[in-house]
Amino acid sequence: RSTAVGGKGTEIAGVLLEKGIHVIQEHPVHYNDIVKLLKVAKENNCVYQVNSFYPNVKNVQEFIVKSNKLLKKSRPTYIDATCSTQALFPMISILGKALSGFHTWKLQTIDSVNSKFPFKVLSGEIRGIPAIVKIQNQLDPKDPDNNGFLLHRIVLGTTEGSLCLDNSNGLVIWNPQMYVPHAEGVLDMYGNNSYVELPV
């Protein structure tokens, strides 16, 4: 656990780097600590990296692969992403891999949200796609690993439907875009949507 969440992980990483031992540290790590540890690594001819971990989890990998395929066949319409404070860096990594990049982006805080709402809400665009990002901006310093409502929930909306990562260790859910043909006397909720034919 890093200094940012009350642990000694950053200190331990520094000692290892001073001995010339390569270090991969899981986020969250404070950016000042990252800069400091990169300098120590360079001075001792070794490597220091921060790992976002979650893009390597099976369900998250599935979401990333399916997002890449989906975006080759349809146009993105929105992103709705939610995470805990500890999982923000990995969420940026997940989004970057799902969208084949994160730049350019512009997000601003929405100040009109109910003050009791446990999430900080940001609105803007990621890669030109309208986006809402909600971050549970709460951390219990005595128990930083608990009290989070979720790790990640990401919905990628497209012209064909929405792909949802329910949680980092949850399900990947496909919801096809509803299409109602205008044929008199015929009620067909799906029409010719090719995504409805995909195996589940």
Regions found by a protein language model. Give the residues of each.
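Phosphate-binding glycine-rich loops and adjacent basic patches that engage nucleotide phosphates
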Residues: 1-4, 22-29, 51-61, 180-191, ...
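Beta-loop-alpha module in the N-terminal Rossmann-like domain of NAD(P)-dependent dehydrogenases
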Residues: 1-40
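C-terminal helix-rich "cap/oligomerization" subdomain common to oxidoreductases
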Residues: 14-15, 46, 200
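A contiguous active-site-proximal alpha/beta segment in oxidoreductase catalytic domains
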Residues: 24, 30-94
